[in-house]
Structure formats: C-alpha cells, structure tokens
C-alpha cells in the first residue's frame, strides 16, 4: 500500500455555508449550543459535556462568546461581580499555549455559573422586543437630535414606573447608536440619585463595555440593558449571588478529552460514538422552543450518508480531512480524496460507520424531537428570582425563537 502525501497547498477551501454542521461526535452544532444553555439553567452535570463538545470541535472563541451571552441574559443581574472574574479568566486563556491547564478555564466558568442564581429577565425582554412590535407611544425617538430636550421626561416616566419593556425596546431597537452613551449616563445618574443610591451598585457600565474587546453594537446594547436591569434588581428584595469560585483539577478534565481509535487494543473507529456520546441531545425536551437548522434538511440522510461533508465545517474535522488532502464536494455532499491511499488512511482513523450504529447511538444525535414545552411554562419555572413580569400574551405568542 502506498502512502497519502500531503498536498494541502492545492486543496480547495471549504467555505460554503452549510445547512447544518456536525461537531466532534456528530451532534448538530446549533442544537449543542441550545442544549448547553438549557442544561446550565437546569444546573445539570451534562453542561460540561456540551460545553466541551463545542470547544473541542474547534469552536473555542464561539464558546466564550456564547457563555458571555448566557451570562448577560440570565446571570448578570444577580451576579454583577462575576464580570471581572470572567474577564480575568478569558484573558488568561488567551495568553496561554494549548494545554489542559488552558482548556480547564471553560470548566471553571461553566462550574461557576452552575452554582449561581439566575433569572429570565434580560432574556425575555430581548425576545419580546425581537419578536413583537412594542409601541413606545411617541414618534420623537426617530429624531436623535431631540434626545437631550425631549426624551428625559419620558425616561423619568419609564424608570419611575419600572416599565422594563419600554426601556428594553428603546435600548435594543430605538436608541440611535450615537446616543447610547448619553442614555447610559442618564440611567447611571438615575440610580445614583436618592433614594435609589442607597441600594444600587456603583458599577461602571461603560468601563465594563470597554473591557470586552471587539464588542459590537448589538452586544453593547445587550450589556446596557443587563446593567440597567441589574440596578433595578438591587432595588428589590432579591437575593444576589455570592462571590464563590470553583477550583477545577486537571484530573477532572480527562473525561472530556477527544477519544481516538486504537487498533492495538481493538478499539476501532466505529466504537467511538457509542462510547463518546454520553447524552442525548434533547433529554429534557427543550429544543422545540427554538428555531433549528434540522428543520431545513433531511437530518437522517445527512447523518447516515453525508456526515463527513457536514462535519467538515467544524474546525476539528476540517483539519482531519485536510491532513488527508480531502476536499468538500458541495454538489454531491461528499469528501473527495485525491487517491485511494488518502481515502483509506482517513477512514482507517475516522470511519464512524454511522449507518451501522445501533439506534440507541444514532438517536443521541438525531432523535425525533417532542413538542412538550411552552415559553409560558419556562417562565413559571424560573420566575422566582426575576423582577420582570411579562404580559401573558407575549409569553403565549413566543413560539420558536432564534437564539
């Protein structure tokens, strides 16, 4: 038998946008993201598995961005002090070479979220503003020049009456970009004015935004809303999270490392998925609350007949395929190899044989989903720590949301 020679300089780039992406162990990427969110809120041990399924698939920066989004949506209002710790740990991660010590930082952050209280306030405010038309009962917000002279009395009304939905709509959708800082100044001064200043926290929101490198306008608006809701939360008899931080030992990381075949011990590639896929993608039936990529494709056909193609869009699989000079064939949804040697060597290492797996294994990734939950039920489940009480018609009207 010959040997596959590296000719990577001649390989066509894999740059077409796919309908789905398979991860390291052939879960659908967007579903791993959503299951991670819900498992963290449910305080489940499986949270760590889903976090590392994304992380070790090569989506390292995306995992950090997702955890920031989760933090601002669900945790910031009750745990504002965690912000600086999060910044510190991400900075450490960015300066370290790839080691287990570096990788365990994700474990530390997720573990810290699991022990902290959370609510749905910011998340629901964002979703309602995104999915419904909120009438602010005025058209002057279209004129940014009128901000200083007209808006302030309206803001006073909103803040004094705790009209969180109008505040959110203004921050997220109506406020002009060049007026965001001015509105933040107004909010800051409001909470520094007696009697509010006796209970609120002196956190500099602008400083927090500046600490988050490469913050775009959407994230900036998200942070501002979370900051305002945190200050309102301080005015209520709600228990805030404690400054506790989890220590993670390297020995705890072994279970999340990528599993490879080992012919010497007769552990062949087709044995990887049954061992590695520890959890089903939707054990708690939350996924039907969201818009999913699987709705745009024949998922079973993709999994059984074209998994290599859809996996090639994950960095870990892209690098594996590139090592054996594979090229994505976008027309046939296959991976083409330049010769039999490259083909054989790739499959000697990674022939997962999805079409031969037991249903128990394949269903971990491509199970049929059951529509059992509504957002109104999720709100009832997590409303204890929140201060925002959405109108019932909003909760009933929320269907499949895009996160």
Spans of model-derived segments:
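C-terminal alpha-helical interaction modules of replication/initiation AAA+ assemblies
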Residues: 24-25, 45-49, 55-403
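Long, low-complexity, highly charged intrinsically disordered regions
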Residues: 4-36
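Conserved helicase/translocase motor-coupling segment
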Residues: 31-37, 43-53
């Amino acid at each position: 038998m010959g040997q596959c020679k590296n000719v990577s300089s001649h390989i066509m780039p894999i740059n077409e946008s796919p309908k789905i992406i398979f991860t390291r162990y052939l879960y659908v990427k967007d579903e791993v993201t959503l299951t991670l969110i819900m498992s963290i809120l449910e305080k489940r041990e499986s949270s760590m598995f889903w976090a590392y399924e994304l992380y070790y698939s090569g989506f390292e920066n995306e995992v950090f961005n997702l955890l920031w989004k989760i933090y601002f949506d669900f945790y910031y209002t009750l745990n504002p002090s965690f912000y600086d710790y999060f910044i510190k740990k991400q900075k450490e991660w960015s300066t370290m070479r790839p080691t287990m010590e570096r990788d365990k930082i994700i474990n530390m952050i997720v573990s810290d979220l699991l022990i902290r209280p959370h609510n749905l306030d910011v998340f629901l405010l964002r979703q309602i503003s995104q999915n419904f038309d909120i009438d602010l009962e005025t058209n002057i917000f279209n004129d940014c020049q009128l901000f200083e002279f007209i808006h302030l009395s309206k803001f006073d009304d909103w803040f004094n009456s705790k009209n969180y939905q109008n505040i959110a709509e203004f921050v997220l959708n109506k406020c002009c970009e060049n007026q965001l800082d001015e509105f933040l100044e107004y909010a800051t001064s409001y909470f520094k004015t007696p009697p509010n200043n006796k209970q609120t926290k002196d956190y500099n929101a602008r400083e927090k935004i500046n600490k988050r490198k490469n913050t775009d306008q959407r994230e900036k608006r998200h942070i501002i809303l979370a900051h305002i809701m945190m200050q309102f939360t301080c005015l209520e008899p709600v228990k805030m999270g404690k400054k506790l931080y989890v220590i993670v030992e390297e020995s705890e990381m072994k279970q999340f490392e990528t599993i490879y075949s080992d012919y010497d011990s007769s552990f062949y590639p087709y044995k990887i998925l049954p061992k590695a896929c520890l959890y089903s993608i939707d054990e708690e039936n939350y996924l039907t609350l969201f818009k999913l990529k699987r709705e745009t494709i024949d998922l079973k056909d993709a999994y059984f007949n074209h998994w290599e193609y859809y996996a090639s869009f994950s960095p870990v699989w892209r690098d594996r395929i590139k090592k054996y000079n594979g090229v994505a064939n976008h027309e046939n949804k296959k991976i083409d190899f330049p010769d039999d040697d490259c083909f054989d060597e790739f499959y000697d290492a990674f022939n997962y044989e999805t079409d031969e797996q037991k249903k128990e294994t394949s269903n971990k990734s491509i199970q049929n989903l059951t529509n059992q939950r509504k957002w109104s039920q999720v709100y009832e489940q997590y409303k204890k720590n929140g201060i925002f009480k959405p109108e019932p018609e909003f909760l009933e009207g929320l269907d499949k949301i895009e996160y």
